[in-house]
UniProtKB/Swiss-Prot annotation:
GO terms for biological process: fatty acid biosynthetic process; lipid A biosynthetic process. Coiled coil: none annotated. It comes from the Bacteria. One of its GO terms (cellular component) is membrane. The lineage of its organism: Bacteria, Bacillati, Bacillota, Clostridia, Eubacteriales. Belongs to the thioester dehydratase family. FabZ subfamily. The active site is at residue 49. Gene3D superfamilies: Hotdog Thioesterase. Its main location: cytoplasm. InterPro entries: FabA_FabZ, FabZ, HotDog_dom_sf. It is an enzyme of class 4 (lyase). It is found in: Cytoplasm. Involved in unsaturated fatty acids biosynthesis. Catalyzes the dehydration of short chain beta-hydroxyacyl-ACPs and long chain saturated and unsaturated beta-hydroxyacyl-ACPs. This is 3-hydroxyacyl-[acyl-carrier-protein] dehydratase FabZ.
Length: 141
C-alpha cells in the first residue's frame, strides 16, 4: 500500500514548511513504513543552513523519520485523529550530509507500543548510503 502527499496529510497534522514526508511507498499500519523526502534547494531552511553550502539539518532528518512513524501508528483505526508527539531521541548517529537534490529514503519500524507511548527505530538513506539512524520515542495525544 502506498500513500500520496494528500493521503499523508489526512493522517498526520504537519503542514508546510514542516511536513517532511513527501510520499509513503510501503506501510503496515502500526508496524512499519517506508517513505521519501525530496530535498530541494527551495526549502526555507537552506537560506541560513548554510549560505553557499546548503546542508539539511540532522534534526530535520530525525523529524522526517518521526513523521513517518506518525503515519505508521496513526494509520491504525484506534489512533485516527490523534497527534503524534516526539518524546525522546536515543542513539542518533549521523553518517552522511544530505543536500538539495538528494532523495532521502526513510524507513521506520515500530518496535514497542504501550498505551499511548511507543518506540520506533528509523534509518534514512541516500542512494543506499546511511545518512542517519535513531531510536525515537513518541506519545499519541
Amino acid at each position: 500500500m502506498s500513500l500520496s502527499i494528500e493521503q499523508i496529510m489526512e493522517i498526520i497534522p504537519h503542514r508546510y514548511p514542516m511536513l517532511l514526508v513527501d510520499r509513503v511507498e510501503e506501510i503496515e499500519p502500526g508496524k512499519r513504513a517506508v517513505g521519501y523526502k525530496n530535498v530541494t534547494f527551495n526549502e526555507q531552511i537552506f537560506q541560513g543552513h548554510y549560505p553557499g553550502k546548503p546542508i539539511m539539518p540532522g534534526v530535520l532528518m530525525i523529524e522526517a523519520l518521526a513523521q513517518l512513524g506518525g503515519v505508521a501508528i496513526l494509520s491504525l483505526d484506534k489512533y485516527k485523529g490523534k497527534k503524534p508527539i516526539l518524546g525522546a531521541v536515543k542513539n542518533a548517529k549521523f553518517r552522511r550530509m544530505v543536500v538539495p537534490g538528494d532523495v532521502l529514503k526513510l524507513e521506520i519500524e515500530i518496535v514497542k507500543v504501550k498505551g499511548p507511548a511507543g518506540i520506533g527505530k528509523g534509518i534514512a538513506t541516500v542512494n543506499g548510503e546511511k545518512a542517519v539512524e535513531a531510536e525515537i520515542t513518541f506519545m499519541i495525544v
